[in-house]
């Protein structure tokens, strides 16, 4: 979900960038791994939530009468469920001001107990038994004024740009119960849903899945019958009613079994579609791009699409996003949610990064591939926004605070930025995109925590991301880097230091960092440095004479601020590093060489002059190292020993 301006009624924190963002304490990671912050409805007590966990929802059916000029609704909401243990009652939610006419359990009228939003009905079934609860109800859902805990689950408004009257739903995170009876638990996805909407003949009604039928009722109304046959979380079930026109296009991804339908319900205003048509058409390009990056579009047997509503952004309702307007980053963001948030959903609101951090990073991926001239400024803006304040973690401690859950700075921008850095740490796009696909397949149609993505990334790439997650996902702040250097003949001593913006929480950041070094009479070179402390010294052999410029993180991979860069002729290496008097023998060579002076087992990393890691291996004293098959040229090798790190130049001929 993304919003561009603050609506007092919505409680969503948003950013000032066009179409940018939606509607903090540290504990030890071992206590957070796989921790389930309560899967909360903001309106239920802990004991009431526990009662809802005694059954599993399989199917939702909504059969509602609605218009486009009022949020008043009437009809039936039912769900089928399976008892997870023997139960004598079932508890679910519906907003207390909505009037209940009858409740049926397995087709039989029953009495019920209603306390606030909690409705408790007798069920009396054994473990594994199925049951159906049908609630007939009517009324006007609350606004933010009448429900301070939420509001806006169902909204009526008029488009200020186009004049169209619209009623639409927006249930994330806790507002589904404001307009239909449900169980608000992230980890209990229904297997499918059906939404039947009876609306005036002048309107269309959009929802999830396929439009199976439009039934004219002969009284000035028609019933739109939608069916979605995939697992779906409660907050992704949607309705939108307005005077729409249907503009349907198709995407044709490589490898897809058939074209993918993109059904767009656009305001029935002669100027609206012409204004947005080119932008809407790009949706097909984005589906084709993401299909290759993440795996098949999860709902390719049904559709993707949009329903317009007067919101300042979008909401990723499953298979049919509700969107206020169309531009490339907003449309890409909401589409990306079909993978990141819908196909795989955060298992708790504390892990909203699974949804919003990844959808935000998909904006960058779209620009990188389709509008590459815009990608650098986009990521720079993301980093700059994160650094407008010193603290804050991506992981959400207060999972009932909607402003914090949907923080544009932390959930969206920092969440996006730390994925970008993980890609840099892997230093291999094949592994990075394999990680994304492996994660999608591992948690298909299910839910996951942030640490689940960490584990998939580690397994796929071989990179240890445990310290990184402690510092960047659970931790707070960002580093400010400074560089000092000293020329020693043709070699250079480089000292990289960093301070932390929130040192009482995260004092040190141990992700690698790259420096682009200008050299006199030679091509600039980019060297990647492994950071282990707030101050690290490196000896770069045969670097050449340093020129007038050293740039920290030239490609913008890491959220960081700039301190200073200066020549410092007082620098001297720590003795332990200076003692590592190691050289490449012979040099130049034909791709086979040894490390003279190496007296312990170490780790060798081979980089090209652009700073790209080509090989990593363990090396022993007196070992012949074979890199034949690498193109002839100049390389840098980094040797990590118990006493420090040394970088040498290597030439193959």
What are these regions (language model features)?
Residues 1-29, 573, 612, 647, ...:
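Bacterial Sec-dependent N-terminal signal peptides
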Residues 22-285, 289-294, 443, 490, ...:
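Acidic/His-enriched low-complexity segments
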Residues 99-104, 485-551, 602-606:
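Beta-strand-rich binding/interaction modules
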Residues 195, 246-351, 403-405, 550:
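Juxtacatalytic substrate-recognition/specificity segment
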Residues 356-421, 425, 443-444:
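Acidic/His/Gly-enriched intrinsically disordered linker/tail segments
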Residues 408-494:
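Amphipathic alpha-helical substructures
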Residues 558-570, 645-652:
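Edge beta-strands of extracellular beta-sandwich domains
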Residues 574-653:
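C-terminal outer-membrane/trafficking sorting elements
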């Amino acid at each position: 979900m993304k919003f561009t301006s603050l609506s007092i009624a919505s409680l969503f924190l948003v950013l000032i960038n066009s179409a940018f963002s939606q509607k903090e304490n540290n504990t030890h990671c071992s206590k957070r791994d796989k921790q389930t912050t309560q899967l909360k409805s903001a309106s239920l007590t802990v004991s009431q939530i526990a009662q809802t966990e005694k059954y599993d929802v399989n199917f939702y059916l909504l059969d509602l009468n609605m218009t486009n000029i009022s949020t008043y609704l009437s009809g039936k909401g039912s769900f089928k469920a399976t008892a997870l243990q023997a139960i004598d009652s079932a508890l679910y939610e519906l907003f207390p001001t909505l009037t209940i006419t009858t409740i049926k359990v397995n087709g039989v009228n029953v009495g019920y107990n209603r306390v606030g939003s909690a409705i408790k009905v007798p069920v009396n079934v054994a473990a594994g038994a199925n049951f159906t609860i049908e609630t007939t109800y009517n009324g006007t859902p609350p606004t933010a004024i009448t429900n301070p805990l939420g509001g806006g689950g169902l909204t009526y408004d008029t488009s200020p740009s186009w004049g169209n009257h619209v009623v639409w739903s927006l249930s994330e995170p806790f507002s589904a119960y404001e307009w239909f009876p449900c169980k608000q638990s992230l980890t209990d996805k229904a297997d499918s849903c059906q939404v039947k909407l009876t609306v005036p003949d002048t309107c269309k009604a959009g929802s999830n899945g396929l439009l199976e039928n439009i039934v004219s009722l002969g009284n000035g109304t028609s019933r739109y019958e939608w069916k979605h046959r995939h697992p779906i979380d409660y907050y992704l079930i949607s309705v939108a009613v307005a005077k729409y026109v249907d503009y349907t296009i198709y995407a044709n991804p490589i490898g897809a079994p058939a074209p993918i339908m993109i059904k767009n319900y656009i305001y029935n205003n002669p100027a609206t579609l012409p204004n947005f048509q080119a932008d809407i058409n790009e949706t097909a390009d984005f589906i084709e791009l993401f299909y290759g990056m993440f795996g098949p579009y999860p709902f390719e047997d049904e559709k993707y699409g949009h329903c317009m509503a007067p919101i300042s952004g979008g909401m990723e309702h499953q298979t049919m996003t509700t969107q206020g307007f169309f531009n490339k980053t907003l449309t890409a963001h909401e589409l990306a949610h079909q993978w990141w948030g819908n196909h795989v959903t955060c298992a708790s609101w504390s892990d909203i990064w699974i949804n919003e951090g990844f959808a935000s990073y998909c904006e960058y991926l779209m620009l990188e591939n389709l509008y590459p001239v815009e990608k650098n400024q986009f990521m720079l803006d993301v980093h700059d926004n994160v650094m407008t304040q010193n603290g804050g973690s991506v992981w959400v401690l207060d999972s009932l605070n909607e402003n914090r859950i949907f923080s544009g700075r932390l959930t969206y921008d920092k969440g996006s930025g730390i994925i970008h850095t993980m890609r840099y740490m892997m230093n291999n796009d094949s592994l990075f995109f394999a990680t994304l696909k492996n994660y999608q397949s591992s948690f298909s149609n299910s839910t996951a925590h942030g640490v689940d993505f960490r584990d998939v990334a580690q397994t796929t790439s071989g990179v240890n991301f445990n310290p990184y997650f402690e510092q960047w996902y659970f931790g707070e702040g960002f580093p400010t880097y400074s560089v000092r250097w000293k020329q020693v003949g043709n070699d250079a001593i480089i000292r990289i230091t960093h301070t932390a913006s929130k040192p009482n929480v995260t004092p040190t950041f141990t992700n690698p960092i790259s420096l682009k070094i200008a050299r006199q009479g030679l091509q600039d070179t980019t060297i990647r440095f492994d950071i282990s402390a707030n101050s690290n010294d490196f000896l770069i052999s045969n670097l050449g004479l340093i020129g007038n410029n050293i740039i920290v993180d030239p490609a913008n991979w890491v959220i960081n601020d700039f301190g200073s860069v200066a020549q410092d002729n007082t620098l001297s290496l720590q003795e332990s590093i200076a003692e590592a008097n190691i050289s490449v023998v012979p040099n130049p060579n034909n791709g086979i060489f040894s490390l003279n002076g190496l007296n312990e087992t170490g780790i060798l990393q081979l980089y090209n002059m652009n700073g790209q890691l080509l090989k990593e291996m363990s090396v022993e004293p007196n070992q012949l190292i074979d890199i034949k098959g690498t193109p002839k040229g100049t390389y840098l090798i980094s040797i990590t020993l118990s006493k420090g790190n040394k970088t040498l130049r290597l030439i193959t001929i």
